[in-house]
């Protein structure tokens, strides 16, 4: 359909297409080996999108925002209910603010970057436990949380999930940065923005 209209197809994919055994950030040319059905379905989506003459496949990871269900909102919700939270500390990735991703997608279309696969994620890598620490630290500074819960680091084996996550899924953003001539936004700077927007929604 996109080819019939002469349109650009933008497909958002995920870090789940990798198996997580790397020791350095994944580039777009790394071999793909999804760990489960979810990752395999995302890889099939990439293959379908790549059939379009003009396509951009953008892999991202650990997306959070003031909307929908995501890690930041879950932490705030369960943190208000419990004195202690156990958070996985041996999975490493790069949180990505949905607003930054949306802005990057618009810029990619405006600048007519070459067809292909790109990575976009939110800057410095961290564990889920470190991400949670940053969320509650900021929430306390913003006056949203008076006493944050105790955060206890645990292993992946102690917290199984239906869709198996890659242990290490840090994405190398350099190809897209070069194409756009910009640097990736820092996910930690987006946390206070999201908290403020959540406060306005609840007001």
Question: For each of these PLM feature ranges, what is it?
Answer:
Residues 157-179, 184:
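A hydrophobic C-terminal alpha-helical subdomain
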Residues 36, 93-96, 126, 171, ...:
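Residue-level signal for the nucleotide or nucleotide-sugar donor/cofactor binding architecture
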Residues 4, 8, 17-58, 62-63:
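Catalytic helix-loop patch of NAD(P)-dependent Rossmann-fold dehydrogenases
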Residues 111-162:
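Mid/C-terminal beta-alpha module of Rossmann-like enzyme folds, strongest
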Residues 187-203:
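Amphipathic terminal alpha-helices
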Residues 50-100, 106-107:
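NAD(P)-dependent short-chain dehydrogenase/reductase
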Residues 66-67, 91-100, 120-138, 193:
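Substrate-binding strand-loop-helix patch
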